[in-house]
A protein has these predicted regions:
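NTP-binding/hydrolysis catalytic cores, primarily Walker-type P-loop NTPases
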Residues: 1, 16, 22, 282-322, ...
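Long, basic/Gly/Ser/Thr-rich N-terminal segments
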Residues: 1-82, 87, 281-287
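N-terminal phosphate/diphosphate-binding loop that engages ATP/GTP or pyrophosphate donors
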Residues: 137-181, 255, 274-282
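Structural motif
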Residues: 4-6, 32-35, 58, 67, ...
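Solvent-exposed alpha-helices and their adjacent loops that cap or buttress functional pockets
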Residues: 26-27, 62, 108-112, 138-141, ...
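Walker A (P-loop) phosphate-binding motif
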Residues: 102-154
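Short, basic, glycine/proline-bearing loop/turn elements
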Residues: 8-11, 177-186
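Conserved catalytic-core segment of NTP-binding enzymes
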Residues: 61-100, 162, 188-203, 208, ...
Length: 335
């Protein structure tokens, strides 16, 4: 894992571009010679990939330059881009270049004095990144200093860039710790990533650190990381994202059993008023749209309350968020 190889593009498929060190996605052409790194991928709506046993042809697993062998994919997805390995990239000492040896390291305990907000979801594409950058933006608008980190996932520059656009003063992810992907990482490796990200984000002296975990709460690495976060008391507040009300109820209950203080729900479930009401009835939590998370009032979510005071505080808080116009109120002339 994380070994860098030089490879030739043999056949274009799903990924027709690859990100450069400048973070620009460059077009790929058959015959191009590229630098990529071996890694696994776990993505229910993309590829499931593993590190191949030999040095034969492999696949491009992500736009971020992760390569491996695809062992599963959605039925409606294009086949992967095929690469032919030429050889390992080696340093001046003749050793293989492995990104893990070049990653940042941290200390314990991480995060410093910042309040840590965890964004975790039911699955891939449940709205985690949207919720995370929206919280960053809302807190920034409230006058807070906010840093952001993505602890797990597959290498891509897209998410860190949008966190920067949202106002985060410092952004780090698992790639900064030397991992092109966190699929199949051990607990020790995940803890190393977490402490590295937390330590270096804390150096910016933020009021808040917003952490996103990729994929869903039933995914192996997510479960390992949640256990680590719980054992070490790292998280102050949790926001859960989901696509439907039943998933909201089961996910929030699972997180509460792990002693995470879930303060709000977001994701695509929030965009159906009926589904949002169902979810709120199941959890007694505010179900918030992206636009509401981006409002300065979001900071009031992240205040510690007694068990007795939380229910009334949450009900009062919902009233302070801006009202999103109902689509039924549109007139023909405004469409």
């Amino acid at each position: 894992m994380n070994d860098v190889i030089i490879a030739e593009v043999v056949e274009l498929g799903r990924h027709t571009k690859m990100e450069l060190p400048t973070k620009r996605a460059a077009a790929l052409f058959v015959g191009d010679v590229v630098g990529v790194a071996y890694g696994c991928r776990y993505a229910t709506r993309q590829f499931e990939g593993v590190i191949p046993p030999g040095n034969g042809p492999c696949h491009l697993l992500s736009v971020g330059g992760v390569c491996g062998e695809v062992v599963g994919m959605p039925f409606d997805m294009e086949p992967p881009t095929i690469l032919r390995p030429i050889g390992y990239l080696r340093g001046a000492d003749g050793k293989r270049v492995n990104l893990e040896r070049l990653g940042i390291v941290g200390s314990e305990p991480p995060f410093g004095a910042a309040k840590v907000i965890l964004v975790v979801g039911a699955s891939m594409d449940s709205g985690k990144t949207t919720a995370a950058y929206s919280i960053v933006h809302g807190l920034t608008r409230a006058g807070a200093v906010v840093a952001a980190g993505k602890v797990t996932g597959t290498a891509s520059a897209k998410d860190p860039l949008i966190m920067e656009d949202a106002g985060a003063v410092k952004i780090l992810d698992f790639t900064d710790a030397g991992f092109v992907s966190t699929a199949q990482c051990s607990s020790a490796q995940l803890w190393r990533i977490l402490t590295a990200i937390g330590t270096h984000l804390a150096q910016a002296n933020p009021d808040y650190i917003v952490l996103e975990i990729a994929d869903g709460i039933v995914q192996r690495e997510t479960q390992l990381l949640l256990a680590l976060l719980r054992e070490n008391g790292c998280i102050d507040f949790t926001v859960y994202t989901c696509n439907d009300s039943l998933g909201v109820a089961s996910g929030v209950n699972a997180l509460r059993k792990l002693d995470f203080e879930v303060v709000a729900v977001s994701g695509s479930v929030a965009y159906s008023p009926l589904a949002a009401r169902e979810a709120q009835a199941q959890t007694d939590l505010p179900v918030l749209l992206r636009e509401q998370l981006q409002d300065p009032a979001v900071e009031q979510l992240f205040v510690k309350h007694s068990a007795e005071g939380r229910d009334s505080a949450m009900k009062n808080l919902v009233l302070k968020f801006p009202t999103i116009p109902n689509p039924l109120s549109r007139t023909a002339s405004s469409l």
